[in-house]
Structure formats: structure tokens, C-alpha cells
């Protein structure tokens, strides 16, 4: 079962799978829609919500949508007759641990939650994570997603690119790895001690880059020189963003074996 908004884009994307899955056309902020989506589920993967850069333009809407959605998911799961048997996965964000420029650029899930100034998206993800963890759901897991690498990333021309400090770092996750880990999470052979814990999602050592290195690689794909050759370095912020290299991303890989 997939819960999706009845937009033209979603209907086009899901049309090829119409005979293979059950689609609930609805809204995560409407409890009855979420309840219908959860009905009969053994696993609930709460992946949807508002993300940047849209989240930066609509901060109040972002907080409402992301928090309300998590509350509805928790309420719907607990309303099921087999609630204690349902396994729930919530997708958090690297943004929850804020600015991590060197020398504090290595991080773990146990690090303090620390949100960048004006980052309403990170606030919403933290409150939503709390709503799931403290709801009373018996079997939950929180996976904090990093930046996702996907082919259309080159089409995202937005001022947010200057909100990223060049000396910052990030351990990226590919879209393929991200999808595979959700599929593997639903397998019956997942160890019992996997649940009721927090994990960081990352595609591993080869995907640990400084933001400057990433900008260079990105620009090279469109035959452009290094950032300092075409941008004024002063256009980029120096801090108050997020991103880190994970000291513990291998833990999730050891459980779910999702990396290519």
C-alpha cells in the first residue's frame, strides 16, 4: 500500500504499478487517510513530508505537515488490533545535528540534537521523530537520512546552494541505496535487536566529501571549472548549515546490507 497525494505527477508515476500495489490517494495531515493506508500493514515506512528547498520557503507549513504526519502515523498504528506486531520506520534527517564543520565533522546518532538557526525543517523532523519514539509504538526505528544523490540533482537550481559552507562535509547516500535499505528492512531475517534504535544512513567512505569537493564534481559534469573560478567565495555561508561524516553508518549497513 502507498499513500500518495492525488497530484498529476503522482498519478503518472504510480500508474505503471496500478495492478501491483494498492494506492490510497490522500494526505498525510488527514488522519482518516493515514488510517486507511496503515490498515492491514505489517510494516509502516513513514518517508513522506516536506523537505528543502520547499521547506525553506514555507516554514510554518513544513512544521505543520511533518509533525502532524508523524502524529497521524503513530495514532493510526496504535489504533490497529495488532499494533504491537507492526514495525514502524521513521526517516529523520542529518539536519537534526546542525553545523558540523571541522574539527567536529565526525558524528554519531548519540550526538546531541542541535538545530541550526532558522532551520524550521530540522525542527519539524526532530519533533516528528519524537512523536514516533514516544508514542508507545512497540517496534520502531529511526533512520536519519543524509543528502541523497540522484540523477536529477543537476536540475535543482536554487539559492540553497549558497547556504552550504564550502568547508563543510557530508556523507552522501545514493537514491538506489536509500530505496534498497527500505526494502531490506521489511525482510523477515532482520535481527530483533535492530528495532527501537537510531541509525545514520550513508553510502560509505567513498561518498564522504567536503562540500568543495562535491561542488567541483558537480560543476565538472556540466563542463564548468571549480567554484572559485565562477562564483565569488563570499557568496557562500561559513556556518549554520548541517552535514557530517558518519562514524557509525557502517552499523546500518551491517544490519541491512543495502550498499551497492
Per-region residue spans from a language model:
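Conserved glycine-rich Rossmann-like NAD(P)H-binding loop of the short-chain dehydrogenase/reductase
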Residues: 1-9
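Glycine-rich NAD(P)-binding loop of the Rossmann-fold in SDR/ketoreductase-type enzymes
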Residues: 9, 29, 61-72, 115, ...
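Catalytic helix-loop patch of NAD(P)-dependent Rossmann-fold dehydrogenases
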Residues: 64, 96-141, 165
